[in-house]
Amino acid sequence: MPYDPAISEPRWQEAWEQADTFRAVRDERPKYYVLEMFPYPSGRIHMGHVRNYTMGDVVARFKRAQGFSVLHPMGWDAFGMPAENAAMEQGGHPRDWTYGNIATMRGQLKPLGLSIDWSREFATCDDAYVAQQQALFLDMLEAGLITRKSAQVNWDPVDMTVLANEQVIDGKGWRSGATVERKELTQWFFKISDYSDELLSALDGLEGWPEKVRLMQANWIGKSRGLQFRFHTVDLPDFPTIEVYTTRPDTLMGASFVALSPDHPLVKALAASDPKVAAFVEECRRIGTTEEAIETAPKMGFDTGLTVRHPLDADWRLPIWIANFVLMDYGTGAIFGSPAHDERDHEFATKYGLPIRATFGERGMDLEQADALVAKAPFVPLKSETVTYVRGFAGAADQTGEAAVDAAIRHAEVAGYGEGVTKFRLRDWGISRQRYWGCPIPVVHCDACGTVPEAKANLPVLLPQDVSFEVPGNPLNRHPTWAATTCPKCGGPARRETDTMDTFVDSSWYYARFTSPHAATPTDRPETDYWMNVDQYIGGIEHAILHLLYSRFFARAMVKTGHLPESAKEPFDALFTQGMVTHEIYMTRDERGRPVYHLPEDVVDGKLADGTPVEVIPSAKMSKSKKNVVDPVNIVEGFGADTARWFMLSDSPPERDVEWTAAGAEAANRFLARVWRLADEIPEDGADPDLTRAAHRAIDEVTRAIEGFAFNKAVAKIYELANAIAKSGAGGESRREALRIMAQLMAPMVPHLAEEIWMKAGGQGMVVDATWPKADPALLVSDSVVLPIQINGKRRAEIEVPKDMPKDQIEAIVLADETVRRFMEGQAPKKLIVVPGRIVNVVV
């Protein structure tokens, strides 16, 4: 009888649900918390979800079988712009759109057979989650972790909201794609910069994280050691000095200009009285705001006509320019340009005809040679490289850049014109968003008392339901009554804060809430102390900076406010970043050469129905616009969930991209059908010690593969075991034992089929409740050994022989081997050396 997943899979899912199999329980067992990054409720799951949650499910089921009390929850990252966009485009309300999508996606995820404790499910837009996030905000405010200040912010003119630096990609808003502008607003900030040094130094302890992610975070935090010093201005009594921070003070003798940010206080003063300066500043605002956008934009400058004195020579004047590449929120908003040793400064100096003077050259160069070296391009060696300083002022003539920087800092401190300081690139996290569909910020503004935290007794502060999205901007600002409230301090009239929180706040502590999702406080410490930390976190590399850095900060904030134990300062013990699921793109071109994309089902043998050949682009990221998206619902309905899971695990290492192909899915389906037949047709008699040995080797190898996140290797070992069962003459209990072992090894990956095989092979209860098998060490020791054969120093063949075979018998087998005879070409061996258990050398 053929295996029918449409019947089997729902039956086992119902059995697990009725038994409450996956409810996480705090008991005497060791705990294991596995968490995949929770999804945004877009309305449809995609193959990336299937891969991500299948990997997490393998780990959860495996650990459960090993005797751990496993927490494997699911929730929804539910606030955000798409719901408002849907309300604007389709009518309706963001809440209805969001909860409708959650219901749809829950219905799509459950048929995958994931071992999730659904009793812990929540959405970040739930009233209960909003209440506890607001309580957490108030605790953080009281602890001094939140501040409100006027600041230059990234303004998305399409979404009409503020973006954090991390949410600006190539100068554009991460959701809208609009060019971001710089604007000054009063904002709420989390003081993440207070933790810069700790967040950086603690990265070394995250041994379970990919090195790439740790490096990305370290670069983002951006610790640097440099010199902060003062240029004295000429004839500017209101601004007698300009403060500058540099990481290369050793190049000070190569300075040719000072450049100010368009947002520098001196520039603002100049713009107030000079329309040309004001116009240039406005032009700068239109090119983007982030370091990345500014680095790639054409370098623009405005000569103010003002000058400063060089700190090493009072008679040496440097011009003051305004430059679009100088950022106000890093350093001091002012730099000195050393064009000889900086690509950006060289480009600027060349464009505006400013001097280019070498500070150092290649080792052994004189001043004239060094100046010639940098005339056309900057000389930027590694700081660890020794160079010759031709315009040096501190330290030896021949020294490394590192030594020269230290010497320059010491020189400045002794001379009194500067101090050595450490700075970080990481800025405070601005969380104010001018949107409706987000968590309200629980503060009020009172004319008498100022800005006042809402009383906890009044939480949650919920969003009004009667809002309109017919015009851009924040509906909360336009609502006739919602903002009007009472001051919790004096009882007088007050106005609610109409900004809502950045949605990254919601996902920065959800892992902690899963430990006690129904608690009347942000966490329930006995539960949280038991379950935290997350033992294995799984998600995309694209979250390396935003989500993961914010979560590390939030964990520290929750420790400080008493909601997490000290041991949870780093919330994720291990992190795995999976690859994408890709698919071929099928494309033709129209009469103007523009691409026209086609659905996979419209292409047969490389052609459309009308015979038009298509271009095939392999391994492309799935994209609705390019019509190469595969719907998991169709795969589950057509092949079953186990086939989708098996394919996702089998095709490539999980950290790499996997290409979904129909042929691959069909092959996975055929293998599972073959496994079913092995269990459906069990001979009555016969034992086979080799099969028992193969089963125990499979236990050992699959266990190590799953523990090492090498799921594709685990799949390969199960293929080998299935082949061993098929070839074996064993029947009866010998075969059933091998099948039960195979069912247990497959259970984390294809749990429904594993239950069927377990049942057919005489397993007790359900395989999901069975203890993970242990390999018998005696059966892992092979009675034979493979010996490579080298002929004249080159490996040409190998033979498998019993471990205790005498040398003379091995020699006879070697000389009789067809491959060996071919390479010997009829010659007698001069030497034949057998190294027992290792190698055979033949010299002819």
Curated annotation (Swiss-Prot):
UniProt-listed InterPro entries: aa-tRNA-synth_I_CS (IPR001412), aa-tRNA-synth_Ia (IPR002300), Leu-tRNA-ligase (IPR002302), Leu_tRNA-synth_edit (IPR025709), M/V/L/I-tRNA-synth_anticd-bd (IPR013155), Methionyl/Leucyl_tRNA_Synth (IPR015413), Rossmann-like_a/b/a_fold (IPR014729), tRNAsynth_Ia_anticodon-bd (IPR009080)
One Pfam family matching this protein: tRNA-synt_1
This protein's GO CC annotations: cytosol
Location of the motif 'KMSKS' region: 621-625
Reaction(s) the record says it catalyses: tRNA(Leu) + L-leucine + ATP = L-leucyl-tRNA(Leu) + AMP + diphosphate
Keywords: Aminoacyl-tRNA synthetase, ATP-binding, Cytoplasm, Ligase, Nucleotide-binding, Protein biosynthesis
Motif window: 'HIGH' region: 39-49
Gene Ontology terms describing biological process: leucyl-tRNA aminoacylation
GO molecular-function terms, A-Z: aminoacyl-tRNA deacylase activity; ATP binding; leucine-tRNA ligase activity
NCBIfam families on file: leuS_bact
Positions with a binding annotation for ATP: 624
Main location: cytoplasm
Name by which UniProt lists this protein: Leucine--tRNA ligase
Homology family: Belongs to the class-I aminoacyl-tRNA synthetase family.
PROSITE patterns reported in the protein's UniProt record: AA_TRNA_LIGASE_I (PS00178)
Coiled-coil ranges (or none): none
Keyword ATP-binding in record: yes
Compartmental location: Cytoplasm
Organism: Paracoccus denitrificans (strain Pd 1222)
EC number(s) reported in the record: 6.1.1.4
